[in-house]
């Protein structure tokens, strides 16, 4: 069993609050469930990148990259900054960054230790 004892130190959530949080988490997980979007967020955890840098880093073509960045932008996970002719992307959603860091620790850091 992962957790045998109940944690009574956490504040009790009402059913309505729990439902609201569950929907928020489900929407975030749904957005991050696409492999390209997950790779983009994993990359953007490191900082701000131009579209060209993201294309090189992740190794996907411009049409797919633009489509997936659009989904992340619409969901509020990333925002853009224009510098002359270049567009830069950065994370705006701290919860997404925390989730990606946790996933990295669980799935990637252990592989490096092996």
Curated annotation (Swiss-Prot):
InterPro entries: ArsR-like_HTH, HTH_ArsR_DNA-bd_dom, Metal_resp_trans_reg, WH-like_DNA-bd_sf, WH_DNA-bd_sf. The keyword Transcription regulation applies. It holds the Pfam family HTH_5. GO terms for cellular component: protein-DNA complex. GO terms for biological process: negative regulation of DNA-templated transcription. SUPFAM superfamilies: Winged helix' DNA-binding domain (SSF46785). Residues 17-111 form the HTH arsR-type domain. Disulfide bonds: none annotated. Keywords: DNA-binding, Repressor, Transcription, Transcription regulation. Residues 51-74 bind DNA. The keyword Methyltransferase does not apply. It comes from the Bacteria. GO terms for molecular function: DNA-binding transcription repressor activity; transcription cis-regulatory region binding. Represses an operon that comprises itself, XF_0764, XF_0765, XF_0766 and blh. Binds to a palindromic AT-rich sequence spanning the -10 region of the blh promoter and blocks transcription of the operon. NCBIfam families: HTH_metalloreg (NF033788), sulf_sens_BigR (NF040642). This is Biofilm growth-associated repressor. It comes from Xylella fastidiosa (strain 9a5c).
């Amino acid at each position: 069993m992962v957790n045998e004892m109940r944690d009574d130190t956490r504040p009790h959530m009402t059913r309505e609050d729990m439902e609201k949080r569950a929907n928020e988490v489900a929407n975030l997980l749904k957005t991050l469930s696409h492999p390209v979007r997950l790779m983009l967020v994993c990359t953007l955890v490191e900082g701000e990148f131009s579209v060209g840098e993201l294309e090189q880093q992740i190794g996907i073509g411009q049409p797919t990259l633009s489509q997936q960045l659009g989904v992340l932008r619409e969901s509020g996970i990333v925002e853009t900054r224009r510098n002359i002719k270049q567009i830069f992307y950065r994370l705006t959603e701290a919860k997404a960054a925390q989730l990606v860091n946790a996933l990295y620790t669980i799935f990637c850091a252990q592989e490096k230790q092996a």
